[in-house]
UniProtKB/Swiss-Prot annotation:
HAMAP family: GpmI. Its cofactor is Mn(2+). It holds the Pfam family Metalloenzyme. Monomer. Mn(2+) 2 binds at residues 13, 63, 462-463. InterPro entries: Alkaline_phosphatase_core_sf, BPG-indep_PGM_N, Metalloenzyme, PGAM_B_sf, Pgm_bpd_ind. It catalyses: (2R)-2-phosphoglycerate = (2R)-3-phosphoglycerate. It comes from Mycoplasma mycoides subsp. mycoides SC (strain CCUG 32753 / NCTC 10114 / PG1). This is 2,3-bisphosphoglycerate-independent phosphoglycerate mutase. The active site is at residue 63. The lineage of its organism: Bacteria, Bacillati, Mycoplasmatota, Mollicutes, Mycoplasmataceae.
Length: 531
């Protein structure tokens, strides 16, 4: 089977719509070609947050749920909503894996480590879930509880960890001082996802061996000291508590990792559990330090096959007949292309939690989705992406144009990470450069794919970010938004419906463009108006 006109889904990660403002990097970047597209082709504004992507009302969207819904064609109740319900009903305290972990700790007279992003951002975690498990552990009679906290500052305002942890200390006091903050780490270190093992190494030391790492005697003073040297929550240097000198992770201890989103939990969790993981073949780690086979590790959700612990509190229920899977079954040839930072998003997440591409790391002969191929472009090795706001967008486009010229693919999924990843640095000017870079790359792609190869581009985003770099209080905004996002379709022969569009309608719309029947699993309709 071969489609009449190939379709390219271009996902501009973090590209939202907002009113003109000095903090609107999208608007201020003067994206001339995007404006040309809007004047030339049908386009609309679509929902990408809250209930429209399976999240609680008014919850900002994120890359994971955005990509899931772009490929799903239906609303999928997301992890945050599920765990909020489990917490509210106290079912989390009855979860089989969590209860077995409590039993394990009591039997071994060992420590329970609660580890995760301690934040109310709701993108990777929510501290309500960790606190619920903490209270459940106390009710179960556990008294040796260690908090290994990861601080946010990216999906929240930059400096909220002080207040969050102050409240946690008060909660510990209210519970007869059961529990201690054993270590702290900014997410820059503990939640790296791009194999920067030098960062993971420091976080690992704070949790596991206490070697060559900072320490503190007063956690609040330590955070204040970090703030004074312009380290916001994301950048807090890992440290351990001197009052818990022997509280490092040991044999027979248990960890419950409370992050529910996989991508930034995979690397540190794999290091903690899997001796065959690439980090242990890397000079950053030595075999003698590995204790993963002597602990019980529980993740809230499935992270990756590289996390070898079998203990998952809420096992996945992958979606079926997502766009990629459906096209594969029809014998259509497809390509996924992104840089390292976002490769899991155009594979694992876009495929509804099905790991056909090994989280984007499979070689083409290892992919378990028929007729599917991948191009992985390395991300720049810089400390923060405002140092290179172009990221790897030019290299992605160069490779993509090579692939387009082959005239082989019926469907291509492309992710440009710039608006999101540079937006997260809080650097407004750099984010404007990031947006302008994408404008230039879209022009190159349009010339080759649409004008020379008669393809159709569907240009959209997974969530907003770069359009609000300064919040209403005048503070730097690094987090995602609840903004609407554009959907532009480069087909002059169609009209689009304007009735509350949402990004989950992108998949059925692409099938409609291909003149392919929409499967029953896709509960939403196409946005194309055939009247």
């Amino acid at each position: 089977m071969k489609v009449k006109r190939p379709v390219l889904l271009a996902i501009l990660d973090g590209w939202g719509i907002s009113e003109p403002d000095k903090g609107n990097a999208v608007d201020n970047a003067n994206m001339v070609f995007v404006e040309y597209l809007k004047k030339t082709y049908p386009w609309l504004k679509a929902h990408a947050s809250g209930k429209w992507v399976g999240l609680p009302e008014n919850q900002m969207g994120n890359s994971e749920v955005g990509h899931i819904h772009l490929g799903a064609g239906r609303i999928n109740l997301e992890s945050l909503a599920k765990l909020n319900h489990e917490t509210k009903t106290n079912n989390i305290a009855k979860n089989d894996e969590i209860v077995k972990t409590f039993e394990y700790v009591k039997k071994n007279n060992s420590a329970l480590h609660l580890m995760g992003l301690f934040s109310n951002g709701g993108v990777h975690s929510h501290f309500d879930h960790m606190i619920a498990i903490y209270k459940a552990a106390i009710d179960y009679g556990i008294t040796n509880i260690k908090f290994d906290l990861i601080t946010d500052g990216r999906d929240t305002k930059p400096k909220l960890a002080y207040d969050f942890i102050k409240d946690l200390l008060e909660l510990i006091k209210q519970n007869n001082n059961i529990g201690i903050i054993s270590s702290i780490s900014g997410r820059y270190y503990a939640m790296d996802r791009d194999k920067r093992f030098d960062r993971s190494r420091i976080a690992y030391n704070a949790i596991v061996n206490r070697n060559n790492v900072r320490s503190f005697t007063n956690i609040l003073d330590y955070i204040q000291q970090e703030y004074m040297i312009n380290h916001d929550d994301e950048m807090i240097i890992p440290a351990f508590n001197q009052d818990d000198l022997n509280g490092n992770l040991k044999a027979n201890d248990a960890i419950i990792m409370t992050n529910f989103r996989p991508d930034r939990a995979i690397q540190i969790s794999s290091i903690l559990t899997n001796k065959n993981y690439i980090a242990w073949q890397n000079e950053a780690f030595s075999d003698a330090e590995f204790i993963g086979d002597k602990i019980r590790f529980v993740s809230m959700m499935k992270y990756s096959d590289s996390v070898t612990s079998p203990h998952i509190a809420y096992p996945p229920k992958p979606l079926t007949n997502t766009l990629g899977q459906y096209l594969s079954q029809l014998g259509l040839k497809q390509l996924r292309i992104a840089e390292t930072e976002k490769i899991a998003h155009v594979t694992f997440f876009f495929d509804g939690g099905n790991d056909y591409f090994k989280n984007g790391l499979a070689k083409n002969d290892e992919i378990t989705l028929a007729n599917a191929y991948i191009d992985l472009i390395p991300s720049a090795k810089v400390a923060t992406y405002d140092l290179k706001p172009q990221m790897s967008a030019v290299e992605i486009t160069d490779k993509l144009l090579e692939e387009i010229k082959k005239d082989e693919f019926d469907f291509i999924v492309l992710n440009f990470a710039n608006c999101d990843m540079v937006g997260h640095t809080g650097n407004n000017k750099a984010t404007e450069i990031a947006c302008k870079t994408l404008d230039e790359q879209l022009k190159r792609i349009h010339e080759e794919f649409v004008l020379r190869h008669n393809g159709i581009m569907v240009i959209t985003a997974d969530h907003g970010n770069a359009e609000i770099m300064i919040d209403k209080d005048g503070q730097v905004n690094k987090k995602h938004t609840t903004s609407l996002v554009p959907i532009i379709i480069t087909d002059l022969n169609i009209k689009l419906k304007q009735n509350d569009p949402e990004i989950a309608k992108v998949a059925p719309t692409i099938l409609d463009l291909m003149n392919i029947e929409i499967p029953k699993e896709m509960e939403l309709e196409s946005m194309i108006d055939h009247n």
